[in-house]
């Protein structure tokens, strides 16, 4: 029965996710691994030029470069995230921020540079192996298993990570309560609103105990009334001690929930700092935010 359930869940994942853009890039097995994760334990602190982790700690990308047909897309970009903080990767369309984000997730390979997780080099690891080490990834596209209920979406991941049934159900109840989705636990995922779907996706990602979560356009497809839900979810993640890396085109909403931001412009880091420092920087205002922007 358990084998049958596992196969059913994997088949449903395949059918549900085949329309997503990320599947075209990574294949079903890699995206499944990115959603189920894997993972463990520690991180750290740091200071200015990378006000994130000190060397050997946290999720750190150094000197990333990527070109397509000899056209440089990113030039010497370094990004760091420590546990318990949210970092935003922002910039104009075509600036290279999405390329940087995808190099960190493992969706695309860097031409040069390194990516480390708590000091361990993961630069050459595929996406699914990064997931096993504790890097969770939520794509922009809906990734819920639509034919499953809310609780079965989360249980599907717990079955891969928690052998004991009683402990599995205890963890399930805890995640349903923490993300305030107990009242919809028996609802089919296909019937969820945008905000509810994001709650379920994040709860399911946490079932795998990741150290870091990478959020790709978390505000996309979300009604204005649900934006506050996303803010609360990110706060919950950092309060749990997870590091969060966000890339999104919704600048104001992103700046309101992060601790630090990096502004990518023309393939390099134009500015790194707190949201207040970012907004006050004249170059950032001139090239990206606009002179009238305010938080």
Report the location of each language-model feature.
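Helix-to-loop junction immediately C-terminal to a conserved catalytic motif
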Residues: 105
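Conserved catalytic motifs of ABC-family nucleotide-binding domains
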Residues: 209
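Catalytic Walker B motif of ABC-type/P-loop ATPase nucleotide-binding domains
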Residues: 213-217
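The feature captures the beta-strand-to-loop junction immediately N-terminal to the Walker
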Residues: 90-92
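Conserved ABC ATPase "signature" region
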Residues: 166-184, 235
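Conserved ABC ATPase signature
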Residues: 188-192, 196
């Amino acid at each position: 029965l358990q084998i049958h359930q596992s196969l059913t869940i994997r088949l449903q994942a395949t059918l549900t996710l085949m329309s997503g853009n990320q599947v075209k890039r990574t294949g079903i097995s890699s995206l499944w691994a990115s959603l189920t994760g894997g993972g463990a334990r520690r991180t750290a602190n740091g200071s200015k030029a990378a006000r994130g982790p000190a060397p050997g700690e946290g999720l750190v990308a150094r000197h990333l470069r990527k070109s397509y047909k000899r056209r440089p897309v990113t030039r010497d970009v370094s990004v760091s995230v420590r546990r318990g903080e949210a970092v935003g990767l922002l910039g104009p369309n075509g600036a290279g921020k999405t390329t940087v984000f995808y190099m960190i997730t493992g969706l695309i390979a860097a031409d040069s540079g390194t990516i480390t997780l708590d000091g361990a080099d993961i630069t050459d690891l595929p996406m699914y192996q990064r997931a096993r080490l504790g890097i969770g990834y939520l794509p922009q596209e809906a990734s819920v298993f639509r034919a499953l209920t809310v609780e079965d979406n989360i249980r599907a991941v717990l079955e891969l990570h928690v052998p004991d049934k009683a402990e599995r159900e205890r963890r399930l109840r805890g995640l349903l309560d923490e993300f305030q989705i107990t009242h919809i636990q028996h609802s089919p995922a296909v019937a969820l609103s945008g905000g509810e779907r994001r709650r379920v996706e994040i709860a399911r990602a946490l079932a795998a105990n990741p150290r870091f979560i990478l959020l790709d356009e978390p505000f996309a497809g979300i009604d204005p009334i649900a934006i506050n839900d996303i803010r609360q979810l990110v706060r919950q993640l950092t309060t749990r001690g997870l590091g969060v890396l966000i890339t999104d085109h919704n600048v104001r909403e992103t700046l309101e929930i992060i601790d630090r931001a990096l502004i990518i412009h023309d393939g390099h880091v134009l500015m790194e700092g707190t949201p207040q420092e970012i907004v006050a920087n004249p170059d950032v205002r001139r090239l990206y935010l606009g002179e009238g922007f305010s938080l």
